[in-house]
From Swiss-Prot:
Source organism superkingdom: Bacteria
Listed EC numbers: 4.3.3.7
Protein's organism: Halalkalibacterium halodurans (strain ATCC BAA-125 / DSM 18197 / FERM 7344 / JCM 9153 / C-125) (Bacillus halodurans)
Pfam families to which the protein is assigned, alphabetical: DHDPS
GO biological process, alphabetically ordered: diaminopimelate biosynthetic process; lysine biosynthetic process via diaminopimelate
Upper classification of the organism: Bacteria, Bacillati, Bacillota, Bacilli, Bacillales
UniProt protein name: 4-hydroxy-tetrahydrodipicolinate synthase 1
Pathway entry: Amino-acid biosynthesis; L-lysine biosynthesis via DAP pathway; (S)-tetrahydrodipicolinate from L-aspartate: step 3/4
Residues the UniProt record annotates as site (Part of a proton relay during catalysis): T45, Y108
HAMAP family: DapA
Gene Ontology cellular component terms for the protein in this record: cytosol
Family: Belongs to the DapA family.
Length: 295
């Protein structure tokens, strides 16, 4: 499964009635494709998946596949902390035309490494779709160790991982010892360039909603050997990347998209909108050099 270098973990637009806004979703898909996204992850944790019903997820997946129209791969977020529910949803999306699925590490129940292995193995055996694992210990409460990831990488349809542990030693071990066709993506925007430097593939990004073309330029410069120019862009983008995570994701990036004129709406409870001070910080971080204008 070739999904490129800059993969955007899409937010889920909501309207004023707190319903999924499918019209705005189509608009967002077109905006992201036009601005540097090589692939889209839909209904993941950036898409507030724990707050979505199964029917909402299915409608979202269908809408994004239709809107993308084969221009970029679409990855459906079907993971949860319920193995059986993840299996059921992974089976359901096979008929929608998605190109793969993403499975987050189970949150709250804190399984052992063997429990994590068996969870992902059971889901992989239930579907023919390519699978991207998603390790995010800061939110799930458990780290998917390198050894466990490498065991999973041997399974036929587990083909990549979004690594958001922030542990470059662990990530380097995975890159060094995984099969040649196993792809490792950064799950942290700010670690995109460092991960590329140790042999990673790219990033599953939140910031690409706002600075996708700039991130794409950074990656392409690095790949062409222009490391100093890539590093300069990295340093330039870093303050905005950090600001987008000053509150629980995706609160700030949704506010930033609204500033760009994209009607993605609010976050669902239990998340809450930015405070006035946080909004001010966000507006200061949206630099005119990115051709972003705050009205």
């Amino acid at each position: 499964m070739n999904i490129g270098r800059i993969v955007t973990a899409m937010v889920t637009p909501f309207n004023e009635q707190d319903q999924v806004n499918l019209e705005a979703t189509c608009q967002l898909v077109n905006e992201l494709i036009a601005n540097g996204s090589d692939a889209l992850v839909v209904g993941g944790t950036t898409g507030e998946s724990p707050t979505l019903t199964t029917d909402e997820k299915m409608a979202l997946f269908h809408t994004v596949v239709e809107a993308a129209g084969g221009r970029v791969p679409v990855i459906a977020g079907t993971g949860s902390n319920n193995t059986r529910a993840s299996i059921e949803l992974s089976k359901k999306v096979e008929d929608l035309g998605v190109d793969g699925i993403m499975l987050v590490t189970p949150y709250y129940n804190k399984p052992s490494q063997e429990g994590l292995f068996q969870h992902f193995k059971a889901i992989s055996e239930s579907t023919s779709l390519p699978i991207m694992l998603y390790n995010i210990p800061g939110r799930s409460g458990v780290n998917l160790d390198a050894e466990t990831t490498l065991r999973l990488a041997e399974l036929r349809n587990i083909v990549s991982i979004k690594e958001a542990s922030g542990n470059l030693d662990q990530i380097a071990e995975i890159i060094e010892h995984s099969p040649a066709d196993f792809s490792v993506y950064s799950g942290d925007d700010s670690l995109t360039l460092p991960l590329l430097s140790i042999g990673g593939t790219g990033v599953v990004s939140v910031a690409s909603h706002i600075i996708g073309n700039e991130m794409q330029e950074m990656v392409q410069l690095f790949l062409s050997g222009q490391v100093e120019r890539a590093a300069a862009i990295h340093r330039k983008l870093l303050p905005l990347m950090k600001t987008l995570f000053m509150t629980p994701n995706p609160t700030a990036v949704k506010a930033a998209l609204e500033l760009k004129g994209l009607p993605v709406g609010h976050v669902r409870l239990p998340l809450v909108p930015l405070t006035a001070e946080e909004q001010r910080q966000l507006e200061l971080a949206i630099n005119p050099q990115f051709n972003m204008f705050v009205s």
